[in-house]
């Protein structure tokens, strides 16, 4: 039987996972935009800063739309998964407690709420793992050995 503290802890853990997903997805969009605009060869810190600001001020749904504009996928499986993540995130942050209403007042109700949070957490966790893997793959592909050597030798990688 879940206590209120356990319920709130699970909500917090799920919220953290949602934010990790959002951050990783934003990183993928920014890295893709950098690649598409050749910022890795011809740096444009002002354009990159503007792009980051737009990403950070956007809803997750808008960031997902940006991703579809910047990066092409062979199939829709990843986009479909990210859309499920968007739905899970919105269920969490837009009315989770309202939807469950008085369930918080009983042990059985709180168990129900925790079970719902576990499902949302699992969906968001899977989305975060995919987005984080994409971000890592883009970074490995785009950051050259020469740029790494310049950075580690004390030279600025930005001209």
Residue ranges and their predicted role:
Residues 1-61, 77, 83-84, 132-155:
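Amphipathic alpha-helical interface elements
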Residues 105-124:
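Short secondary-structure subsegments characteristic of cysteine-rich extracellular domains
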Residues 123-134:
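Amphipathic alpha-helical coiled-coil segments
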Residues 103, 159:
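Conserved catalytic or regulatory cores that recognize and/or transform ribose-phosphate-containing ligands
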Residues 78-102:
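Histidine-centered, metal-coordinating catalytic motifs and their short helical/loop contexts
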């Amino acid at each position: 039987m879940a206590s209120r503290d356990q319920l709130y802890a699970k909500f917090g853990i799920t919220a953290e996972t949602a934010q990790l997903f959002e951050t990783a997805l934003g990183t993928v969009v920014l890295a893709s935009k950098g690649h598409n605009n050749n910022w890795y060869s011809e740096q444009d810190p002002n354009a990159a800063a503007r792009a980051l600001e737009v990403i950070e001020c956007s809803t997750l749904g808008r960031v997902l739309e940006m991703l579809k504009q910047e990066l092409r996928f062979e199939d829709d499986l990843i986009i479909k998964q990210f859309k499920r993540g968007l739905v899970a995130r919105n269920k969490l942050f837009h009315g989770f407690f309202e939807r469950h209403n008085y369930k918080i007042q009983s042990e059985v109700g709180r168990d129900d709420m925790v079970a719902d949070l576990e499902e949302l957490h699992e969906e968001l966790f899977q989305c975060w793992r995919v987005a984080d893997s994409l971000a890592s793959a883009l970074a490995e592909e785009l950051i050259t050995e020469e740029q790494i050597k310049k950075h580690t030798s004390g030279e600025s990688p930005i001209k």
